[in-house]
Amino acid sequence: MSSRYSPYRIRNVGERRRVQERLLSEFNSRPVTAVAAVCAVCLETYCVQSNNIIDFLMPSECTHLFCYKCVLNMYKNAMNVPRAAVSCPMCNKKVGTWQAFFPNSVVSCKFIKKTGDRTPACLQFMLALKTIQDRYMATEEEAETEPSFVIKNLQAQLDAAQKEARDLQESMERQKQAHNVAWNSSCEQVTALQTTLADMQAQLDRSEALSSTLAEHNRAANVQIDSLRRAVQRLEAAQSAPVSVNVEFNDNARQNTNLHERFRSYVYSTVSDMMIEDSIKSLQSHVFGAACLPCSVNVEINFPFDE
């Protein structure tokens, strides 16, 4: 027997109940499966899970299944007829109580007629419409396979990818700007360092040139100092010992006796003061000048340490 049960072939009520109990026990022992039930009035098929509440009612007097919508319509039609009882539309048996099927249990329920204000027709229509919409609403698995759902999902993924691409582009732009700023700063620093290095190199060259000049001056000064030291030594030695000076003139020097006497006095005074032979020659040039004839002067200086 399929999961879709139709008890219309069985005429005996007791046998129908036994079949129903057996089916319920089989349903309870079986794993959770999808069950398709058909309303006996509207013939609409409803898919439910075997472990969930079944949205069907069955009269206690028979085994016909009715959906809630059809049961409510039965009571609504009976409300307009005084002292009318609700009967099964299939077997015309009066219905006193109804059985609702819950997981592993069967609950009996009874509808009580109230004399209060009736629900407006517009509200009833809206409630019935909402019930039908909820009942026929696509399941999550069916919605995932619909083209509109797939398109929305792809569109959402595309929007997310575009947003990520924009964020990445903005991040790259910021990094590029930061890199350009750092590069420009580095170039300026390198230029400044090169300028400073060139200035330092020029200063170093000037320092080297000045050092070489100072070294030459030092060498010249050292030479002069050595010569002066030797002269001082000679002067000190000359001052500590007597000096004999002999001056001889040739025949040309006798032409002017006054000049020779004057020159001789200068020679003695200079030799006694400076003890330098070059000074004697400069004095000769100063005294005689260019007017006199050249003459030779022999100056012999005897020091005690030359012996």
Swiss-Prot record:
Zinc fingers typed RING-type, residue spans: 39-92
Domain of life: Viruses
Alphabetical keyword list: DNA-binding, Early protein, Metal-binding, Zinc, Zinc-finger
SMART domains, per database record: RING
Family matches, as InterPro entries: Znf_C3HC4_RING-type, Znf_RING, Znf_RING/FYVE/PHD, Znf_RING_CS
Single GO MF descriptor: zinc ion binding
Name under which the protein is recorded: Major immediate early protein
